[in-house]
Amino acid sequence: MSELASQQCEACRADAPKVSEQELSELMHLIPDWQPLVVKGELQLRREFTFRNFKEALAFTNRLGELAEAEFHHPAILTEWGKVTVSWWTHKIGGLHRNDFIMAARTDQLLSDPLHK
């Protein structure tokens, strides 16, 4: 288990601090397949996962949904034939919190499933 994925998410309040530029740089090294991008003025993490077909993409989406429910932290998910696009950010603060990086790392761990190509 990666260092980041083994960390616990914390309850996030509306006044919680967003990650700093330095924290962003440090944390991105731990999830190198994710891209930071600004969407509607909010910094998010995004990654596209590829699969052999829609059934595998949907199975991954469902596993991710279970993970999100367990942590009470939910991503934006777009499921298509052979592809799932996942975006993490913290709605309450309108940007990135450490929890988003933890959840991105945990999302990566779902790839150990043999359904992923």
Swiss-Prot record:
Keywords: Lyase. It catalyses: (4aS,6R)-4a-hydroxy-L-erythro-5,6,7,8-tetrahydrobiopterin = (6R)-L-erythro-6,7-dihydrobiopterin + H2O. GO terms for biological process: tetrahydrobiopterin biosynthetic process. Its EC number is 4.2.1.96. InterPro entries: PCD_sf (IPR036428), Pterin-4-alpha-carb_dehyd (IPR050376), Pterin_deHydtase (IPR001533). Gene3D superfamilies: Transcriptional coactivator/pterin dehydratase. GO terms for molecular function: 4-alpha-hydroxytetrahydrobiopterin dehydratase activity. Belongs to the pterin-4-alpha-carbinolamine dehydratase family. HAMAP family: Pterin_4_alpha. PANTHER family: PTERIN-4-ALPHA-CARBINOLAMINE DEHYDRATASE-RELATED. This is Putative pterin-4-alpha-carbinolamine dehydratase.
